[in-house]
Amino acid sequence: AKADLAPVHFFAPSPASRIRWDNTQDTPLPPEMKVGDNPLEGAVFDYYLAQPATGPITLTISDPSNATIREFSSIAPPPDTTMPNVPEYWLMAPTVLKTTAGHHRFAWDLRYPDPPTLNFSYYGNMIDYREYTLNWHALPGQTYISTVVGPMVPAGTYTATLAVGGRKYARQFSVVQDPRVN
């Protein structure tokens, strides 16, 4: 009820677990095969906007020393024009914050930014496309666009700061080790 009265409400996130996908390289299921949706992975942030945002909004993730790890925006990044060697329906859409009125959910995969890469083939020569090997558990729309992803953050306490209309809303959250690892 309190969120209904505030122009912006940034909900306290639950702890996020560092869980990695396996590395099995095999043929994925065809995209037309019905499969269940996986839960969002990483840190999940919920925010409420009583009115549409009048400008861009940002979500900044900071480490315990207040250094910025990642920043996300409501402005889409420029598209990567390098063609992939797989159908584009496998690739994940860019992560963009929503600015419409209402409740929104955003997931951060607990990773640092992707490193810059050069497009090399398996044989070591430069190529003019992005080369992917899809895992057997690949799902349409959930394959990273970058062929090399950034490393995961270590377990610890982090701060997420949502900036909307010139105001900032900060929430601390914890990243915990995979509970299956001891």
Predicted regions and their residues:
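C-terminal low-complexity, glycine/proline- and small-hydrophobic-enriched intrinsically disordered tails
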Residues: A1-N182
